[in-house]
């Protein structure tokens, strides 16, 4: 049986760990509220922009754009949005496994498959397994639209220079604190979602022209999709970390209970042994 001193030391250690996990849970909860507000604000804008692009792309007097041009099977780029920090349950492991699954199931469709990682954890997992086109790390602490726009512009430049022919975006979409859905979207070429036909579709007047507006909105659409994916990932990360730290705190409390019981039993056994020794000594003196 472990000594009283070692058991007490373990109890103190687990209590300190529980204090840390509880603090991390509270911090994640505060960050999650802000991140969730950002996601909720970004979703309607991204959806409405997609609807405008869908209407423009169906117009007969618009020839399209190089960003919508489909090329015959070639080089593909997969963007994986992970996190810079750990202690968030299976958040990073799940997204990396999804990237591995994409490479295994669809890699044969392309002449070459490269990966771009956003977040240190994804890069560390994938760097020795796949060709990493580029890595962005330590950007989530000060995440803003300008950062996402910069990445999107670099992707657009690479696509127009034919460095790759298709771009896919893999990220955790935020559903709730307990649920994050791994989502795969095609970023390039842009393929607007086809909405259901309306009985009465209003005819809009576009200025200066539909073609000019399409050329202006397509890069903006890619920027917005990138920014939204990163916001979704940040909210998912905080939700996953909050859940993981809550679970860790509960496990620590259970362990403290078991160790305390073990400590009390050991202490009781030690006291009983001491009493038996005293009684035995007393009996021997009397005898």
Swiss-Prot record:
HAMAP family registered for this protein in UniProt: ATP_synth_gamma_bact
Family to which this protein belongs: Belongs to the ATPase gamma chain family.
GO process annotations (BP): proton motive force-driven plasma membrane ATP synthesis
GO CC annotations on file: plasma membrane; proton-transporting ATP synthase complex
GO MF assignments: ATP binding; proton-transporting ATP synthase activity, rotational mechanism
NCBIfam families: ATPsyn_F1gamma (TIGR01146)
Oligomer and partners: F-type ATPases have 2 components, CF(1) - the catalytic core - and CF(0) - the membrane proton channel. CF(1) has five subunits: alpha(3), beta(3), gamma(1), delta(1), epsilon(1). CF(0) has three main subunits: a, b and c.
Designated name of the protein: ATP synthase gamma chain
Keyword terms, alphabetized: ATP synthesis, Cell inner membrane, Cell membrane, CF(1), Hydrogen ion transport, Ion transport, Membrane, Transport
Compartment list: Cell inner membrane
Membrane topology listed for this record: Peripheral membrane protein
Species per Swiss-Prot/TrEMBL record: Geotalea uraniireducens (strain Rf4) (Geobacter uraniireducens)
Gene label: atpG
Its biological purpose: Produces ATP from ADP in the presence of a proton gradient across the membrane. The gamma chain is believed to be important in regulating ATPase activity and the flow of protons through the CF(0) complex.
Cysteines paired by S-S bonds: none
């Amino acid at each position: 049986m472990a000594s009283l001193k070692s058991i007490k030391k373990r109890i103190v250690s687990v209590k300190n760990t529980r204090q840390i996990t509880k603090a991390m849970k509270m911090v994640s909860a505060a960050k999650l509220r802000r991140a969730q507000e950002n996601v909720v604000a970004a979703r309607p804008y991204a959806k409405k922009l997609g609807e405008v692009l869908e209407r423009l792309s169906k117009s007969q007097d618009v020839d399209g754009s190089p960003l919508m041009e489909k090329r015959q099977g070639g080089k593909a780029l997969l963007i994986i949005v992970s996190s810079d920090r750990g202690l968030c349950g299976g958040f990073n492991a799940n997204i990396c496994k999804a990237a591995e699954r994409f490479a295994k199931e669809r890699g044969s469709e392309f002449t070459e498959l490269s990966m771009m990682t956003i977040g240190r954890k994804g890069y560390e997992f994938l760097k020795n397994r796949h060709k990493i086109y580029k890595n962005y790390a330590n950007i989530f602490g000060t995440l803003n639209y300008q950062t996402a726009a910069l990445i999107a512009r670099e992707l657009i430049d690479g696509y127009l220079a034919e460095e790759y022919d298709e771009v896919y975006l893999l990220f955790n979409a935020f559903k709730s604190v307990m649920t994050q859905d791994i989502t795969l979207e095609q970023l390039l070429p842009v393929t607007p979602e086809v909405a259901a036909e309306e009985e009465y579709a209003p005819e809009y007047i576009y200025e200066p022209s539909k073609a000019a507006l399409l050329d202006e909105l397509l890069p903006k659409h890619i920027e917005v999709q990138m920014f939204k994916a990163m916001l979704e990932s940040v909210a998912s990360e905080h939700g996953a970390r909050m859940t993981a730290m809550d679970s860790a705190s509960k496990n620590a409390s259970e362990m403290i209970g078991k160790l305390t019981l073990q400590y009390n039993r050991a202490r009781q056994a030690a006291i009983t042994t001491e009493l038996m020794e005293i009684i035995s000594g007393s009996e021997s003196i009397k005898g």
